[in-house]
Amino acid sequence: MAPKTEPGRRVVADNRSARFHYAIEDTFEAGIALTGTEVKSLRGGKATIGESYAGPSGNDLMLFNAYIPEYLEANRFNHDTKRPRRLLLHRRQINKLIGATQRQGYTVIPLKIYFNDKGRAKVELGLGKGKQLHDKRESVKQRDWQRDKARLMRDKG
């Protein structure tokens, strides 16, 4: 069955492995400063955020290593595919995220890139710590148990 989405929210890129590799404690919604060809390429549904992360650059928070492919109909005015992109957050949120990454060993990971109901590109950021190997095994056990439990309930009912 297809996953249910919120009305007016069209997901372009999803970082599904982030919740497996990191224990996400808090999420934030941020805007992205994009060029015109980047927006057109995102509307085509092509982006990769599997290896990307967010980090401080001066007083701002930037999205690093996010791949947005070149727009095919653009000519010489195309964008760099892996350039750092500025994240648009309130100053209080930026200070909280930068402080957590510098002092407490947290990482800021992009979880999704989507268009909201107004047509603006947004990033869902997760603040979390990396999981150890035994934590990942526990996550796999929990997922398998939930799957087996659902299968048993379906077969009994």
Curated annotation (Swiss-Prot):
PROSITE patterns: SSRP. It comes from the Bacteria. One of its GO terms (biological process) is trans-translation. InterPro entries: SmpB, SsrA-bd_prot, SsrA-bd_prot_CS. Its main location: cytoplasm. The keyword Manganese does not apply. Residues 132-157 have a biased composition (Basic and acidic residues). Gene3D superfamilies: 2.40.280.10. Residues 131-157 are annotated as: Disordered. Belongs to the SmpB family. Required for rescue of stalled ribosomes mediated by trans-translation. Binds to transfer-messenger RNA (tmRNA), required for stable association of tmRNA with ribosomes. tmRNA and SmpB together mimic tRNA shape, replacing the anticodon stem-loop with SmpB. tmRNA is encoded by the ssrA gene; the 2 termini fold to resemble tRNA(Ala) and it encodes a 'tag peptide', a short internal open reading frame. During trans-translation Ala-aminoacylated tmRNA acts like a tRNA, entering the A-site of stalled ribosomes, displacing the stalled mRNA. This is SsrA-binding protein. It comes from Methylorubrum populi (strain ATCC BAA-705 / NCIMB 13946 / BJ001).
